[in-house]
Amino acid sequence: MGGKREAFAARREAMGFTQEGLAAAVGVEFYTVGRWERGVLTPQPWRRPRIAKALDVSLEELNVLLDSPDLPQPVTGQVLMGRPPQTSLVPSSPASAVTADQVDASDAFGPEIAEHVRRSREEWLRVRRAAGARGRELTELAAWLYPVSKRAPGGHVLTGPDWLLDTPVELNSVRLKFSEVERPVSKLKPVDHVLPLTARGERYAGYSRAVRDLVRPRLLENRLSYRLLEVSQCNGLELTFGTTTFFEVFDIKECLAHEFKAAWLASGGSVPDWSALPLRSTIGDPFDPARMLMSPGISTLTIRKDRRGEHRFMMHQRDGRAVADGGGMCTVMPSGEFQPSSLAAVDVHNDFSLWRNIMREYSEEFLGNPEHDGAGTSSIDYAEQEPFRSFEQARADGRFRLWHYGLVMDALTLGASQRTVAVLDDEIFDRLFTGLVATNDEGHVVGEGGRTDMPFTSEAIDRLEPRLSASSLTLLRLAWRDRQLLLG
C-alpha cells in the first residue's frame, strides 16, 4: 500500500476544496478523495484529466502529487504551479494500489461515511421542508420564472396552450382518447444534487425511495397512472392519455421542487436564476408532453347549491404526516390521481373516465371508504355498487352537475392537474353524504361555525386565501367569477 499523499492533500486545500468538495467536482463518491490521500486508492488514468483540471495542475504535475509519499525528500528544479519544491518522486507500488472503481462502498463503512450520510440526509430534509413565509410562496415565486402569457388568471399557477378554458364546459363534453403507443421521454438528469445518501453512502436511486425511507408518509404507493399525451381544443376539449406510474411522475416533480428550494435558500429568499436550476432548464417547454412526463390528477371544487341562495363549498386540509406532497395546505375536495382502480387490463379501460375517477374520490374522501386500489376480487360495477349507483342516479336526474375548466400546472413542481367543479342540489348533497367524515386518510375537512363546509362567498374565499394551495385558489376564483353559470 502506498504512503499518505500529503502533497496531493496540500494542493487540494490550497485550491479551497474539502475532500467532499473535490469529490463532487470530479464526480466520485465523497469517501474516495480521502482514500486517494491515504494512499489506499489510486485514480484510474481516465479520471486524472478531470482531477488535474479541478486542482489547476498539468497531468504531469498531478502524477507528481499522486506519487509523492508522506516522507518527503528534497528535489531540485521542481516547482509546482509557483509553489516551493515539493517531495521526491517515490511512486507507490502498483501491485498494492487499489482503484476507487474496484472497491465496493461497503468496504469503506465507518465513522467517516456515517457522518457524511447523516449530514447529507439532514441537509436534504432541511431543503425539502422549506416552505417560505406562506404555504404557497415558493409556488408563486417559481411562476415568476415564466412569462405572464404562461400564467393563469391571478398568476398563481401556469397554463399551457389550449389548457385552460375561458368558460367551463360540462364534464360530458370533454373527450378522452386512449393510446397504446409507447412515447418515451428523456430522463431527467443528472439528479445527484437533489438526492440524499443511503445508509451505504451511495446516492438514492430515486426521490420516491428517499421519501419512503426518510419522510415515511403513511400514504405512498406506486400505482399505474394515466399519462397525458396530447391536449386539443379543436371542436371542444380533447385529452389523449397513455399510461405511466405514480413514482415516475412523482420523482420528476419532487426533484424539480427540491432543486428550486435549494436555490431559493442559497439566494437568501430571492427568485433563483435559471443558471441555478439545471434540471428545470433541460426540460425547456414544460407544457409539451413529449418533453415532460405528466399525469394530471383531478381536483374538484364541490358546491352545495342551497335553495335559499346560501351556497357552500367543501375544503380539505392535507395532513403532512400522511401524504407525500402538499401537506399542510388547504385544497378543494375531492382530489386525487387520475388512475385505474387496478393493474388489470379490464380496469385500465373500464376506469378510463373522469367521472368514474371523481366518484371513487368522493367515496374515499367524503364517505371514508377504503381506497379503491384493486384489492377487491372483481372490477367495480359502477351501475350497481354503492355509492356509485346513487351518484350515477343523481347525475342522470340533473341534480349532480359537473364542469371542467381544463388544466393548470403547479410552477414549483411542474405538476399538471385538471380543474373541475361539482354542483349538487342541497337535498341531494345531504342524502348522498349523510355519512360525511370530518377526517379521512389524507387530512380533515375545513369548516366554520361548527359546520363541515364554508360559505361560497367572496369574503370567505378572501379569508381562506393564505391557507389555500395555488391551484385551489385559482379554481375558487374562477368558480366565483363564473358562479351564475355554475349555479344557474
Segments predicted by a language model, with ranges:
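DNA major-groove recognition helix of helix-turn-helix/homeodomain DNA-binding modules
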Residues: 46-62
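The alpha-helix within a helix-turn-helix
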Residues: 12, 23, 52
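NUDIX/MutT-family hydrolases
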Residues: 417-420, 431-481
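Short, charged recognition helix plus adjacent turn
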Residues: 64-83
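Short alpha-helical DNA-recognition segment
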Residues: 16-35
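Alpha-helical and coiled-coil interaction segments, frequently adjacent to or embedded
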Residues: 77-307, 312-329, 461-488
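Conserved Nudix-box catalytic region and its N-terminal flanking loop in Nudix hydrolases
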Residues: 308-376
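A short, Lys/Arg-rich alpha-helix, primarily the initiator
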Residues: 1-15, 49, 64-65, 72
